[in-house]
C-alpha cells in the first residue's frame, strides 16, 4: 500500500477549516505570523506554501520579511512584539537563519504558548515527559497521523528511527514511545544499520542521505515512512529509502515526494488552531 500524504493532508486541511469556522463563530480569528530572514529561494517557496495553506483553511497569515543583515536584537524585538500581540496565536521563524544569528536564542524567545513549530524547549520537554496539550513538532506529528490513517498501531511493535535531529529524529522517537512502540534510534555511528532496520516493524527514515536505506534491508511486511528529501545530480527527488526495492517488501510505504512533506505543512495548521483554542480559554 502506498500511503498518500497529499490525500491525507487534504483531509486534515478540511478538518482544520471546519475548526476555524467554529472558532470564528465564537469570536476567535486564528492568526499565524511567519518571520523570514534574508532571500533564500527555498525559504521563500516554503513561506508561500504556508500562506496558501492558511488562506485555504481561513487562518489569517502575515509574513515579516527581514533583511539578511538584521541584527539579533532587532529580530528578538520583533519576536517580542508578536508574543505580545493578542491577534497572533502562532509564531513561526523560518529556518535556517543567517549564520550571524543565534538560532537557538531566537526559537527560545518565542512564547511556548505561540510555538507553532513545537520547537521551544518547554514544548520539547513536555513531549518527552508526556504532558498533553502542547504543540508537537510538525513532521513527527504528521508521521503519526499517516500511521493512524494507514491503520498502523505502533503498540508493541519494533520501530526504528534513522536520524537523531532535534526537529525530527528525537521527537519522532518520543512520539512512537508514547504510543507504546519499542523504539531504536539509529544514526551515522550505528554499527549495523542494515541489521537494525531488518528487525523493525516500522521504519522512519530521517537522516538526509539519498537512498541510504536499501530495499533488501526492509523486513517483509514492515511499514516504511520516508521523511528524507534529496535532489540527485539528474534533478530527481528521492528519499532516504531505496523506494522501488523497499516497496516490494513493505506492507505500506510513503512516496517521495508526496508522502511526509504535505503532512508537515498540514500539522502546522493543526498546531495553530490548537494554540488559538488554548489562547481563547
Swiss-Prot record:
SUPFAM superfamilies: Aminoacid dehydrogenase-like, N-terminal domain, NAD(P)-binding Rossmann-fold domains. NADP(+) binds at residues 163-165, 188. InterPro entries: Aminoacid_DH-like_N_sf, NAD(P)-bd_dom_sf, THF_DH/CycHdrlase, THF_DH/CycHdrlase_cat_dom, THF_DH/CycHdrlase_CS, THF_DH/CycHdrlase_NAD-bd_dom. It holds the Pfam family THF_DHG_CYH. It catalyses: (6R)-5,10-methylene-5,6,7,8-tetrahydrofolate + NADP(+) = (6R)-5,10-methenyltetrahydrofolate + NADPH; (6R)-5,10-methenyltetrahydrofolate + H2O = (6R)-10-formyltetrahydrofolate + H(+). GO terms for biological process: L-histidine biosynthetic process; methionine biosynthetic process; purine nucleotide biosynthetic process; tetrahydrofolate interconversion. GO terms for cellular component: cytosol. Keywords: Amino-acid biosynthesis, Histidine biosynthesis, Hydrolase, Methionine biosynthesis, Multifunctional enzyme, NADP, One-carbon metabolism, Oxidoreductase, Purine biosynthesis. PROSITE patterns: THF_DHG_CYH_1. Its EC number is 1.5.1.5, 3.5.4.9. GO terms for molecular function: methenyltetrahydrofolate cyclohydrolase activity; methylenetetrahydrofolate dehydrogenase (NADP+) activity. Pathway: One-carbon metabolism; tetrahydrofolate interconversion. Belongs to the tetrahydrofolate dehydrogenase/cyclohydrolase family. Homodimer. Catalyzes the oxidation of 5,10-methylenetetrahydrofolate to 5,10-methenyltetrahydrofolate and then the hydrolysis of 5,10-methenyltetrahydrofolate to 10-formyltetrahydrofolate. This is Bifunctional protein FolD. The lineage of its organism: Bacteria, Pseudomonadati, Myxococcota, Myxococcia, Myxococcales. The gene is folD.
